[in-house]
Amino acid sequence: MEGGCGSQWKAAGLLFCVMVFASAERPVFTNHFLVELHKDGEEEARQVAAEHGFGVRKLPFAEGLYHFYHNGLAKAKRRRSLHHKRQLERDPRIKMALQQEGFDRKKRGYRDINEIDINMNDPLFTKQWYLFNTGQADGTPGLDLNVAEAWELGYTGKGVTIGIMDDGIDYLHPDLAYNYNSDASYDFSSNDPYPYPRYTDDWFNSHGTRCAGEVSAAASNNICGVGVAYNSKVAGIRMLDQPFMTDIIEASSISHMPQLIDIYSASWGPTDNGKTVDGPRELTLQAMADGVNKGRGGKGSIYVWASGDGGSYDDCNCDGYASSMWTISINSAINDGRTALYDESCSSTLASTFSNGRKRNPEAGVATTDLYGNCTLRHSGTSAAAPEAAGVFALALEANVDLTWRDMQHLTVLTSKRNQLHDEVHQWRRNGVGLEFNHLFGYGVLDAGAMVKMAKDWKTVPERFHCVGGSVQNPEKIPPTGKLVLTLQTNACEGKENFVRYLEHVQAVITVNATRRGDLNINMTSPMGTKSILLSRRPRDDDSKVGFDKWPFMTTHTWGEDARGTWTLELGFVGSAPQKGLLKEWTLMLHGTQSAPYIDQVVRDYQSKLAMSKKQELEEELDEAVERSLQSILRKN
């Protein structure tokens, strides 16, 4: 079972980890309340809510917890509604009533690079270079998602539903209507089953409709373009369009219809301003954990997240959604393989797809559906990248409905390719087991053809275990110049039930303060020599009070490695002015399997990463068997 990390929070009999946030800003209170009843039951909850003038929804991921909302209250204000809170607390049937605080969540659609209106009279399929790159808009031929191979094999996303968690979907759009799944859709901003975008003169709420078209736009209907998984179904989950986000709305959206929705696509997150450190709150963490444990009949909901649009001034490891083990974080490249100007780099990004963010050529953007039956060529940002990945994953799920959420991450690592991607800052490197990765692009660009072929024969990976590899609790000063270097020796819980031999995710849970948080640089090196940049410089972050409080920095760069040995943590400052800092805690969290995940997989391509990894696993198994035999002989003698 998956749990969180950080401080613990108990609800509905389950123990979860909570990311701790602190802010100097005054809180904003919303018209949403988290309510727990002494006697559980939806009829009881409806009666209690009605008596107090509230609407009500049951939270699907927790027993006895309900979402009460009051349309007569202001959606956002600086003071608590003490009258309504006390009214609820005085009711003997109510055990707890907590008014929800509001916080910012931003869509990850980069500003338009070119505002020229494009004539949309003709279908846009030939302009969808991310599907078939023949060199359109001065792109690099062949640099695409390789969907052609998947389609030729007969995989188009049939039987798979993707939920777009966003500002709504124009489900009346002729290119989306046929594939729209109304049963799996809901509007959490207005509390009704019709997630249609709210009208604005500037079409601000076109974000979700554009993302939906990338995934599920119908094929061969002479309208706009074609979705990556054009026979998949798309569900609209409207949840972004209100003055402030709340934990209860995020949690409800992430846990909506987990037996109907297979993949959740999120192109939003905390503000990408280069100085925010934020992530999911208690209820949302619980909903995510519930999703990967129970969604899709126990195979786990698949959460796809845009890595962020903060550019070189930000680091996506400061985003608790993109850096979560339970999400697949996706970055973007432009059509010639270069990085987009808005791309954030971090060690938690798993792979990349495509968007625009450098070129002014009007056809270099992502072609997709737009509001009110229109089409656009101007979709961009990592907002465009995440839905493309969701579409590729839908093709893989059609090829093998038994894939778990972890299987999808393994397939992503094994089938993504460097192709012709080019990062001007970070070199491509190989980790301790030979897997090639990049600090910005992850393990490379998704390859739909390779993924569906491997998915067809895929055997579910072994059980996952969690090990606290060790902890440094003594405060250590970070010098103004040079680095603080700490080491941890771990056996990865060998000899115990939770022994982790083959790594998936690694977290460094860190508490640290600095006179200027943005100048802090943190690196961690594994026993097999793989260096992960956990935190890079963020020049706009001038925080000197909050720091990081039990923040789980995550890396995927040590995937497949042996965790046993010495881990090294390096902390220092990068900047023109001298700074001071204090590391209060470093806890090493190891997540992975005891048995080799690829040793029983079918290899079709003997040049593939799977073939290389399986060969290495077989050699390691043989070496360990020989070692055990020698030790047995020595003991007998």
From Swiss-Prot:
Residues 460-596 form the P/Homo B domain. The active site is at residues 166, 207, 383. The keyword Disulfide bond applies. It is found in: Cytoplasmic vesicle, Secretory vesicle; Secreted. One of its GO terms (molecular function) is serine-type endopeptidase activity. Residues 25-108 form a propeptide. The keyword Disulfide bond applies. GO terms for cellular component: dendrite; extracellular space; membrane; neuron projection; neuronal cell body; perikaryon; secretory granule; secretory granule lumen. InterPro entries: Galactose-bd-like_sf, Kexin/furin, P_dom, Peptidase_S8/S53_dom, Peptidase_S8/S53_dom_sf, Peptidase_S8_Asp-AS, Peptidase_S8_His-AS, Peptidase_S8_Ser-AS. Serine endopeptidase which is involved in the processing of hormone and other protein precursors at sites comprised of pairs of basic amino acid residues. Responsible for the release of glucagon from proglucagon in pancreatic A cells. This is Neuroendocrine convertase 2. It comes from Rattus norvegicus.
